[in-house]
Amino acid sequence: MKRILAILLMLTMILSAAFAEGNPGAEDAQAGSPEVVRYDYDELVVGTAMPMYGAFSMDNWGNSTSDVDVRKLIHGYNLIEWNSAVSGFQLDPSVVTLGSLVTRDDAGNHVYSLTLYDDMYYSDGTKITAWDYAFSWLLRTSPLISEIGGATRQADYLAGWSDYAAGNTPYLAGVQVTGEYSLKITISAEYLPFFYEVSLLDCYPYPIQAIAPGCEVADDGNGVYIRNKENPDGGALFTADLLKNTLLNGTNGYLSHPEVVSGAYRLVSFDGAEARFELNPYYKGNSDGLKPVIPRIVFKTANNETMVDDLLQGKYGLLNKVSRADVIQDAMMRAISEGAYMADAYPRPGLSFITFNGGKSATADPEVRKAIALCLDKEALKDDYVGEFGVKSDGFYGLGQWMYQMVSGTISQEPDEGMTEAEKEQFQKDWDEVTLEGQETYEFNTGRANEILDAAGWTLNKAGEAYDSSKDDVRCKKIGEELVPLELKLIYPETTEIGEALDIWFAAPLKEAGILLTIETSPSVLPIYYGQDNTDYDMLYLATNFDVAFDPTQMFMEGGSVNVHGVKDAELVKLAGEMRQTEQGDLLTYCTKWISFLKRFTEVEPMIPVYSNVYYDFHPEVLQNYKITQYISWADAIVGSYFSDVAEEPAEAAE
């Protein structure tokens, strides 16, 4: 597994170069190519195969990749940002002034005293102040969110949040407003150390006038709270009923149709498949001093079967996160070889996986889950969908995660300059011992699956007699008074178009182990995953891209806000907690704990990792300064991009 990512990326570069230089038949293809497409330089149309669900303002209702992209486009001035140059989080220097500092109080809490710039505005011209950030924390972590179908954000890292979430106090002690443009954020000592500590300050401002009209944020010295703006002794206006209307209204609710925003663009319309945006004239720019140039953006769901044709016809100016092997190859052959288009490849910080319903008798059994995992031909399924642009996954990680890259040898940590030769040698030895080798991989083996099921007592047929594979279709087991058959249902998102491959490489092998699998598609799988839909299922086929601040505890803890019906495991939660409670900068210790977490993951097998892959973005050469590999999202990269007929000057020449 050593350097597998480097090899994969090298392969993609070789393929890109080969298609750019030409290939057999390329001249004929070019001869028949349509005339040069003329783009509307005032509008960029972005296409992706990943659907939008409309959670454009908060992650309390889901975190789909496309929704995250929209959030980054329309919400700005987060207190923190990811600095790719140092591979770490930092306070955003365009939002927080240099006079801000962090101290430790007598209780061991970390207190961040932040001073904000006074030149930030919402898209309607309203000034953004410290009160807007305070409202954001109060809203996202409020117990009212769960009353209207969302997941209250767990903020146990904030001092006093547990009392606020439980309704014991109306105020949030860990957030204080000390001036119109100054905040104090207190991180609880119980949560420290935290490897991604600065990421805990993740917060966009939200306009209280749009979400909670008639309310205001106050702070009497104990922490921030929400009260009536007028008639403070009257009935509280900040209620679940109010938020249900202002957040979830299908026409103008702030969750899916926010009008007043703080980002580079503002949302003009959204119909479920297409979102339109225009420049926010009040946006002052990002920390690099860049302001958006392209006046309008259209973001829409693209069809894998037609997206390359649409790119060549000028219907798209950017295809984002292209995954399917045949689509990538088609784009390379017909777009890149033509010479007027560009391709950017970057490793995915996530994976596709199959999650189990831990509330079902069959899939609650870890031995059943292991047997099911052995019946999935990951390599074949991967080849069918992402081909040479991906690798099968044997753990809960993605190719783009820094931990995977370090442990697999793609990148390395240099020893400190002051180390002696002996210390350097020991340092390297310690890193060599941190490896993915030896982890259970559940290689495709239906024979072993049958052995596991036999040993686990799944040895009866539907008549309650001994199971005989030569004449019985389904294994059963007596659990209590119920005879439970291994008749299972898997649901996958209709946009993935992977149903046929699942039939061949998963459902068919499962039959050999006495498991009958029904495969169904759904346009809304994520609401099931987040517990917002009561659809019956045994397994879900999903994909995720991890946050840079990797913290999987919510996935596996009782009462977690994601994977609500999934398998829970206290030991996994414990190991995830130990992983995050690592001193900042101690990469070796963090990766060592990460390996322990992955080992337990394979012992429990709460999910079946399937594959991780390299994403491709395709765009015409006239879209310039689009540097997706330096950012987390296309929405960040597009701020510095522009259309121009003048060829982009190479970086070396520019210097």
What are these regions (language model features)?
Residues 150-240, 411-419:
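Surface-exposed binding/hinge segments that line
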Residues 364-507, 596:
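Append "and occasionally in soluble cytosolic enzymes with long acidic Gly/Pro-rich linkers
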Residues 46, 125, 311, 317, ...:
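Periplasmic binding protein-like
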Residues 250-256, 273-276, 282-331, 516:
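Ligand-site clamp/hinge motif
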